[in-house]
Amino acid sequence: MAKVLELAVLFPGPLAGRLLLEQGFEVVKVEPPGGDPMRQISPTLYKVLNEGKRVVHVDLKGDAEEVRRLAEEADAVLTTFRPSTAERYGVSYRKLAEARPDLIYVAIVGYGGDEYPRDHPSHDINFAALAGAVGPCPPYVQAVDVAAGLLAALTITAMAARGARGYVEIPMSRAAALVNILNLSLRRDGKPLVLSGDYPFYTVYRCRGGRVALGAVEPKFWERFCRAVGREDLIPRRLDPAAREEVEKVLAGMDCGALEELARREEIPLTPVYDIDRALAIFPPEALLNGVNPRSERTR
């Protein structure tokens, strides 16, 4: 069993570590003496991300030697330290590879190119903002953190499988751009950002009793939707932002439950917009990462 030393707190790094654990890696997580701040931010998420790992507490400011010893026993190191911080603590790839030259070292860093100062402190919203993925309202989900964690786990899994070794960076800024790659590509192609919510076929509408999300990306679904709500005249206006107001008027007078039933019956990609409490009842966090290993008994 390959062993991973996780030098990470909060979200992206621990997510990668948990995914690796599900793939059969042994994960040893190093936390500061006060523990991972996620313990206080969300005890539930801390448990989800770190259950099954062996956790050790080390004060890197005064006892980096303990981490170097753990690194000598590991096949891979996963870290979210800024490069300057890893160097200052003596746990950089350069330092750890002195004793373990065949080490896999994957670092989730902030910035990897010339897009911004390399060591600038940032979080999910900052990376998304620089990638053109933040509108007037802040993003509600931490998609960049999740993307970076997935990429880090995939990188370590792939390197271990093919016997590769060395240092690899996963820049959060690039993960943010990857999350937004469709819009970046549409802009490069000179085409409108059709999934921005400005167009009638892909947005959120109010109805009696709540809201619904319409995702009629394919023309056949837009046509099916227009016929179902009695507005065949809107079929040619799929790419007309002004048609959104017409749809708003129609759906505002319809019951959300009836709309959901209509969508299911006619096979239209329209669903209710649940609040966080309704979503929690359907998707308990404790179960979300169970079974990502296809060999797991939990998937059978």
Region roles according to the model:
Residues M1-R162, S296-R300:
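N-terminal helix-loop segment corresponding to the beta1-alpha1 unit
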Residues A2, G166, G210:
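Nucleotide donor/acceptor-binding cores
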Residues E6, T79, P171, L214-A216:
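Active-site-adjacent beta-strand anchor residues
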Residues G34, G110-G112, M172-V179, G209, ...:
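Glycine-rich beta-alpha junction loops
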Residues R39-Y46, K191-P192, D198, Y274-R300:
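Active-site-adjacent capping/gating segments
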Residues L130-Y140, D189-P200:
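Glycine-/small-residue-rich "gating" segment that lines the acyl/pantetheine channel
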Residues V141, A147, M159-P192:
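Substrate-binding/catalytic subdomain of NAD(P)-dependent oxidoreductase enzymes
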Residues P200-P272, I276-R278:
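Aromatic-enriched alpha-helical interface/lid elements that frame and gate functional surfaces
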